[in-house]
A protein has these predicted regions:
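A short acidic, glycine/proline-enriched capping/turn motif at secondary-structure boundaries
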Residues: 64-66, 87-90, 98, 108-111
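RNA substrate-binding interface of SAM-dependent RNA methyltransferases
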Residues: 2-5, 43, 50, 87, ...
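A general structural signal for well-ordered alpha-helical segments in protein cores
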Residues: 14-18, 45, 89, 98, ...
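A glycine-rich helix N-cap at a beta->alpha junction
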Residues: 73-94
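Glycine-rich phosphate-binding loops that contact phosphosugars or nucleotide phosphates
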Residues: 103
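Solvent-exposed alpha-helices and their adjacent loops that cap or buttress functional pockets
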Residues: 29-31, 94-96, 115-119
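Boundary-proximal intrinsically disordered activation/regulatory segments immediately upstream
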Residues: 1-68
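Short coil/turn connectors at secondary-structure junctions
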Residues: 54, 78-79, 99, 119-122
């Protein structure tokens, strides 16, 4: 079971990854091996875990710990879980966590281009994408 840490100080630097870093800082364009991504719901966290990503911190509503997120916690090893009531988390992040759970993961190494294209029938090359979540929207 991970270590559960009650949030008592919103300025704690350990919470920066969830509240004070920009997308560009999380991606760490100049040092991609240090890049981070945030999974923003139990379903997305489960997918990341299934793909082999390892979380280094979680942010979670207190009521989720013994409820819907119990299965996620069992898979997260020693990653610290920062927790508080919904209102405190909204104050920290600037928005209400709709599913009550966030997880911070280190970005995995990218596979070689040859491996990605090996069985592909089509390949799209997109340059200068700032926010990949908008692709296809």
């Amino acid at each position: 079971m991970p270590t559960i840490i009650e949030i008592t100080d919103l300025s704690d630097p350990a919470l920066d990854v969830f509240a004070r870093l920009t997308e560009n800082q999380l991606r760490s364009r100049l040092e991609p091996e240090k890049g981070v991504f945030i999974a923003e719901s139990p379903k997305v966290i489960e997918r990341a875990l299934d793909a082999g990503a390892v979380p280094f911190a979680l942010l979670m509503e207190r009521r989720k710990i013994d409820g819907p997120a119990r299965g996620i916690l069992a898979r997260c090893g020693g990653a610290p879980v920062y927790t508080a009531d919904r209102e405190v988390l909204a104050q920290l992040t600037g928005y209400t966590l709709t599913r009550g759970v966030l997880a911070a993961f280190h970005r995995p190494a990218l596979p070689p281009v040859e491996a990605l294209c090996q069985n592909a029938r089509r390949v799209a090359v997109l340059e200068n994408i700032v926010d990949s979540t908008n692709i296809g929207a």
